[in-house]
């Protein structure tokens, strides 16, 4: 059997992985085995947190809207506000409503008073 000379392929692969892990601390940026383990772990975390970010932002928007709505009227909640929005066919998503709640509260109060009728 003839000998297969791989040249610099393995070194190129390792340097590519090292570049990925260059900002890691300690052995996680120096030793090849730990670099590969940490790389897998980092990519798993990134994949998981991309989905998680969507949930977290939705929760934040709902919290902001609810805080402003409850400040307007004590007996009025986020749940009723969204329900009335759908009944009146005002299609504003939660992100936009949260931005309105932060930047222009009087506008959100106007919207809530209009749909409450």
Swiss-Prot record:
Single GO MF descriptor: rRNA binding
UniProt superkingdom: Eukaryota
PROSITE patterns xrefs: RIBOSOMAL_L20
InterPro entries attached to this UniProt entry: Ribosomal_bL20, RIBOSOMAL_L20_CS, Ribosomal_protein_bL20_C
Compartments reported by the entry: Plastid, Chloroplast
Family per record: Belongs to the bacterial ribosomal protein bL20 family.
Name of the protein in its database record: Large ribosomal subunit protein bL20c
Species of the source: Carica papaya
Gene: rpl20
């Amino acid at each position: 059997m003839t000998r297969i000379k791989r040249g610099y392929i393995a070194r190129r692969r390792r340097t590519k992985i090292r570049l990925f892990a260059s900002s890691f601390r300690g052995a996680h940026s120096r030793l090849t085995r730990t670099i590969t383990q940490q790389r897998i772990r980092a990519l798993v975390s990134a994949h998981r947190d991309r989905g998680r970010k969507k949930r977290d932002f939705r929760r934040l928007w709902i919290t902001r809207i609810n805080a402003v709505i409850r400040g307007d009227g004590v007996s009025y909640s986020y749940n009723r506000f969204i329900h009335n929005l759908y009944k009146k066919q005002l299609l504003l998503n939660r992100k936009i409503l949260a931005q309105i709640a932060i930047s222009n509260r009087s506008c959100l109060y106007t919207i809530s008073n209009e749909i409450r009728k």
